[in-house]
Amino acid sequence: MKKISSRQEIREQVKKWQEQGLTVALVPTMGCFHQGHLSLIKKGREIADRLIVSLFVNPIQFGPGEDLDAYPRPYEKDSRLAEELGTDVLFCPETTEMYGPNFQTNISVTTLTADLCGAGRPGHFDGVATVVTKLFHLCQPDFAIFGEKDFQQLAMIKQLVIDLDFDLQIISCPIYREDDGLAMSSRNKYLNAEQRLKALCLSQALEVAKDYVLARSAAGKTIESDEVITKARGVIIDAGYEPEYISIVDQQTLEPSPTVQPGNVMALAVRIAERIRLIDNSALLT
């Protein structure tokens, strides 16, 4: 595995591959790999001739008071795992390499980022869209692989690819969960034992919602989204938390759906502690 930290070098490497007619997959990450990340890397290895994993903690997607400084950075461990899974290039630029001293450009995908996580994290998705755009330009991938846990981010990136005419395919991979159902996240490392147990309320709320929807559907009844949200909210309240949001939306437009329809997704966010905010989502009717 080759480690590259400069924009010029990654461009040169990709150009060599392209001249050989090789396809390229990109897995953008902020590091601190868990099994969810590794599933993305494995998928990239399966579908392309060459695989780039980017490892960059992107400062412009963190808001004031968020965990940029505390965000875990186990670089050596991440590097070893990427190499073990057959990564060809680990692209690990410094912040000053990605963003020059006079950097002024901001990419914004407006409508898709207005609600859900976007409502409580102003500027976050602009930061994600900007760094992803730069990575797409630098790495010129044929495929880019993202996880479905960051449901709103995935929808935004798909729209970004359409709007900016990127010649690449977005591949999504399912949420990777712990044995007890908790969606894997780099921020799970922050949880103490009590918080870790209570954090199960996210996946439990989704299961309660799905069970309710399936029962109503089997009975041939209309399923009001507000009823389902109330059921899910009760699970989170019982765990001692107030959800930041719970919403049932169209999986492509992210528009709220007044009644549950096939393909709708329930997405939710809960702040477990001051700097520990977890998200999860699930389709309700397939």
Swiss-Prot record:
Report if keyword Ligase is assigned: yes
Instruction: Give binding positions for beta-alanine.
Output: 61
The GO terms this record gives for MF are: ATP binding; pantoate-beta-alanine ligase activity
CDD domains the UniProt entry points to? PanC
Q: What is its EC number?
A: 6.3.2.1
Function text: Catalyzes the condensation of pantoate with beta-alanine in an ATP-dependent reaction via a pantoyl-adenylate intermediate.
The UniProt entry, under PANTHER family, shows: CYTIDYLATE KINASE/PANTOATE-BETA-ALANINE LIGASE (PTHR21299), PANTOATE--BETA-ALANINE LIGASE (PTHR21299:SF1)
- What's the protein called, per UniProt? Pantothenate synthetase
User: Species name for this entry?
Assistant: Desulfotalea psychrophila (strain LSv54 / DSM 12343)
Q: Which gene encodes it?
A: panC
